Amino acid sequence: MICGANATNGTNATKEYTLLVALPLSIAVGLLILLIIFGNVLVIIAVFTSRALRAPQNLFLVSLASADILVATLVMPFSLANELMGMWTFGGVWCEIYLALDVLFCTASITHLCAISLDRYWSITQAIEYNLKRTPQRIKRIIFIVWIIAAVISCPPLITMKKSEGDICDINKEKWYIVSSCIGSFFLPCIIMVLVYIRIYQIAKKRTRAPPGDHRKNEVGKKENDPHEKLNGIQNAEPDDKDEINGVDMEESSSSDHKVSNPCSLKKKSSKGKTKLSQIKPGDGDKTEACQTTKASRWKGRQNREKRFTFVLAVVIGVFVICWFPFFFTYTFTAFCDCCVPETLFKFFFWFGYCNSSLNPIIYTIFNNDFRRSFKKILCRRDKRRVV
């Protein structure tokens, strides 16, 4: 795939793999395929069966897991067969489809990560507005657009590739295609994703440093001098954080399967959002203190949850880049120096990228309590049924 001599003589590859090499390689790739399918099916089941994971944004993870499953079932087995046999024996039509699917699923994975990053960014910068708009239907539309973008990028192999000749299945090696496909499938989405994530990190860092309500000091200071905002010296009741609606944390309500009883949510407001004087009774001071304590503790919990989510997102993005960057870098390099990259190294990077499809379920298990609990429930149920 790197040098013209090697590409045009695919039958030579059969001499490279003896039975002692082909058998362990087949077992290793076979186990990798099973791990990818098992782990990602587990993710899909967990999202649809666990109340803690039914938040609309987790549909992104379902679609991402589906892309990884498709890689394991429609791409990797044929890549393994082509590698071991040193020739393509599945026909010219399937060769074209296979190459397009390979690009499609890889591109879909990184565009999903871009969408997840943007979703997280909007949920932080436009908390109330975006959380109200973040419905399953809206997320499904975004996922559909993600797949359309990936499909558009993966179409050129079907149109411009050199048709498979004999037992060779290889993509178009024209410089313009290599460069454009690498930019569209990896480098551009990767840059967007990293920039968005850096912005997310900066915002999360600022909010972690500021105690509740500090980001609204100026607004509150202005309102204290406004006679319309006071009633007999009593300041109007306002939520202390834009992530709350009637005392309910938007993200907490969407990601937790426990109902939280909050005294702050029991406050009644007039049509203009002002607290009525007749509603203030003796003993309300204790309730106010309890309300403030509840809000402060919930604020700390929300900050910890944002940190964890941001960290998990960083790990997923980082692992994806680590797995696929070597391949795309060397593949782009071949456009300018066809024989400068050793074929063995290129093949290693090629298969190393596929390993990424098995890692997301492991990341969720290690860093996300909800997924870990859901996986345990799913697996324990199966064990109990076997015992019975």
Curated annotation (Swiss-Prot):
Residue(s) at site: Implicated in catechol agonist binding and receptor activation: S181, S185
CDD domains, per database record: 7tmA_alpha2A_AR
Biased composition (Basic and acidic residues): 212-231
UniProtKB keywords: Cell membrane, Disulfide bond, G-protein coupled receptor, Glycoprotein, Lipoprotein, Membrane, Palmitate, Receptor, Transducer, Transmembrane, Transmembrane helix
Membrane-related topology note: Multi-pass membrane protein
One example GO MF annotation: alpha2-adrenergic receptor activity
Site (Implicated in ligand binding) location in chain: D102
Protein name as annotated: Alpha-2A adrenergic receptor
Organism: Danio rerio (Zebrafish)
